[in-house]
């Protein structure tokens, strides 16, 4: 099987064969693809701002923000615009090129809160930063409003395969997620979509999720690979840790089947050592979340701080990527 070609007709068996490639050979192939399509010295550093925290009505089994579980998360109302702008300004000074605004909503509603989010998007975009939002389900009209406000990307993760999905979430369907992604794809806003490792899924579930993403034309602009952090009070609090080599395999496979996408080493990164993260970067990860306040990610896991990340990047000979230093996705035929 040749690698390094952009294609949208991946079969599960092909992706499984990539995933099962002997580890060092897999890393080598993924690194080769990465160097073909990306600057291997650059890492995009992102900042997540939880603009509305907790009290989510959904039952995602991994999430501490669900109102159905007894966790330590304290609900927080929608932040005011000035607070968000100040956080974004500080992040930009640290070298961050993308700000992701997350709200614990099931879906976006056409009300004053959405209007406030649109203002946040516009103001932070005007600072020269890429802005990504993750707000739940989205209609086509709402996607167009976000596009008009200047939104660069919309995050809506698949989480896992369509077959395993109902084991983890029952309050929205897999089809609901795909519909939101399609609504975004009808605009010039790019798609950010990935999944979570450690939910109890099989390797075939991981492969199936990647196939769903890799058969989108164009591929998602970015693909977050999250590692489950077992949050006390959630149904998945006793799940075993994901082996780091599973994370590396998933990153490498995503890099090979979606060569132009950013592969984001996302939630759960704080548990990885610098050596383990270096293997992830070798395998094709080229984006991370960083913070100066140890605030939680959307799955409520601590995020490494800017200083530690800058030290690591310096050690590895890597640098922070400026905003929008990558081409916009284009629709192509299979080659």
Swiss-Prot record:
Which Pfam families does this chain map to?
BATS, Radical_SAM
Query: How the cofactor binds, per note?
Result: Binds 1 [4Fe-4S] cluster. The cluster is coordinated with 3 cysteines and an exchangeable S-adenosyl-L-methionine. Binds 1 [2Fe-2S] cluster. The cluster is coordinated with 3 cysteines and 1 arginine.
The beginning of the lineage is: Bacteria, Bacillati, Cyanobacteriota, Cyanophyceae, Nostocales
Which class of enzymes does this protein belong to?
transferase
What's this protein's function?
Catalyzes the conversion of dethiobiotin (DTB) to biotin by the insertion of a sulfur atom into dethiobiotin via a radical-based mechanism.
* Family per similarity comment: Belongs to the radical SAM superfamily. Biotin synthase family.
Question: What EC numbers are recorded for this enzyme?
Answer: 2.8.1.6
Radical SAM core domain: residues covered:
41-269
Subunit structure comment from the entry: Homodimer.
Question: Gene3D superfamilies annotated for this entry?
Answer: Aldolase class I
State what protein this is by name: Biotin synthase
Per the entry, which co-factors are needed? [4Fe-4S] cluster; [2Fe-2S] cluster
Keyword terms of this UniProt record: 2Fe-2S, 4Fe-4S, Biotin biosynthesis, Iron, Iron-sulfur, Metal-binding, S-adenosyl-L-methionine, Transferase
């Amino acid at each position: 099987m040749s690698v390094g070609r952009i294609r949208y007709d991946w079969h599960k068996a092909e992706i499984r064969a990539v995933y099962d490639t002997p580890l060092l050979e897999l890393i080598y192939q993924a690194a080769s693809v990465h160097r073909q399509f990306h600057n291997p010295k650059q890492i995009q550093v992102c900042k997540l701002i939880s603009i509305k925290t907790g009290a989510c009505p959904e039952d995602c089994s991994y999430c501490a923000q669900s109102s159905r579980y007894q966790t330590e998360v304290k609900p927080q109302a929608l932040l005011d615009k000035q607070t968000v702008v100040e956080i974004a300004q500080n992040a930009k000074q640290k070298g961050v090129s993308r700000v992701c605004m997350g709200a614990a909503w099931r879906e976006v509603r056409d009300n004053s809160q959405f209007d406030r989010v649109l203002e946040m998007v516009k103001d932070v975009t005007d600072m020269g930063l890429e802005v990504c939002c993750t707000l739940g389900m989205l209609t086509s009209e709402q996607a167009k409003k976000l596009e008009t406000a200047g939104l660069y990307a919309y995050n809506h993760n698949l989480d896992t395969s369509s077959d395993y999905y109902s084991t983890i979430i029952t309050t929205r369907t897999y089809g609901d997620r795909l519909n939101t992604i399609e609504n975004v794809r009808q605009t010039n806003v790019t798609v950010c979509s990935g999944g979570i490792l450690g939910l109890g899924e099989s390797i075939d579930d991981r492969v199936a999720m990647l196939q769903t993403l890799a058969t989108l034309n164009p591929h998602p602009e970015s693909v977050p690979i999250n590692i489950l952090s077992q949050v006390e009070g959630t149904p998945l609090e006793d799940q075993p840790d994901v082996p780091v080599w599973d994370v590396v395999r998933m990153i490498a496979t995503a890099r090979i089947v979606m060569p132009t996408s950013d592969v984001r080493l996302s939630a759960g990164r704080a548990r990885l050592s610098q050596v383990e993260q270096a293997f992830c970067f070798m395998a094709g990860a080229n984006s991370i979340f960083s913070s100066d306040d140890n605030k939680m990610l959307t799955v409520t896991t601590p995020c490494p701080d800017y200083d530690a990340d800058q030290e690591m990047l310096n050690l590895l000979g890597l640098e922070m990527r400026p905003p929008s230093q990558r081409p916009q996705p284009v629709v192509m035929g299979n080659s």
